[in-house]
């Protein structure tokens, strides 16, 4: 596998693409010595997404549905996450496909993000709605167990910000209204 990162001059990632591995094999057919080429893995198709030295992001995104059939979550999670997090040239259809996959694999994605100990991607994960309230609570426990206090503090703040329960002030006001007097 190869991960390629395209960065702006300020160091901000513009796009990150995962090129999975692939295998080539030849089968010999009978006494005629005819060889058949077999390709396994989406890495070959991903490497064909170039034209005159320029990457074709739409072509790269089009391989994802087939990759979901052939590749493991170990390959697919970085492919989907990287395209969402650094979404240069991402079409609405491709975004929807990647988001669906990230939501389906949200527990594994969260585990990967917690291991990296990077706050920006973790915040993006919850801010965009890929993670649920229960997951942020679990993430706080994991970060605490790993003694990552900056992560714990940030996760607690995001939980309050993103998953705040509605205040019951309207109910309290109606019970203690003094307008009747």
What are these regions (language model features)?
Residues 1-102, 107-129:
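Solvent-exposed loop and capping/linker segments of extracellular ligand-binding repeat ectodomains
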Residues 9, 99-114, 126, 134-144, ...:
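Ankyrin-repeat boundary/"N-cap" motif
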Residues 45-49, 123, 135, 153, ...:
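Generic marker of "main functional regions" within proteins
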Residues 118-126, 148-160, 164, 176-177:
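Ankyrin repeat structural motif
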């Amino acid at each position: 596998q190869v991960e390629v990162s395209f960065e702006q001059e300020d160091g901000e990632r513009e796009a990150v693409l995962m090129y999975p591995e692939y295998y080539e094999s030849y089968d010999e057919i009978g006494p005629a010595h005819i060889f058949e080429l077999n390709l396994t893995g989406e890495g070959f198709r991903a490497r064909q997404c170039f034209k005159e030295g320029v990457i074709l992001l739409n072509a790269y995104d089009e391989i994802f549905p087939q990759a979901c059939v052939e590749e493991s979550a170990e390959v697919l999670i970085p492919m989907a996450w990287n395209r969402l997090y650094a979404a240069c040239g991402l079409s609405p259809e491709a975004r929807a496909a990647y988001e669906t996959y990230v939501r389906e694999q949200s527990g594994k994605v969260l585990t990967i993000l917690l291991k990296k100990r990077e706050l920006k991607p973790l915040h993006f994960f919850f801010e965009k709605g890929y993670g649920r309230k229960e997951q942020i609570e679990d993430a706080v426990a994991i970060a605490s167990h790993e003694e990552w206090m900056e992560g714990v503090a940030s996760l607690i703040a995001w939980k309050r910000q993103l998953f705040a329960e509605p205040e019951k002030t309207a109910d309290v006001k109606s019970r203690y209204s003094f307008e009747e007097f």
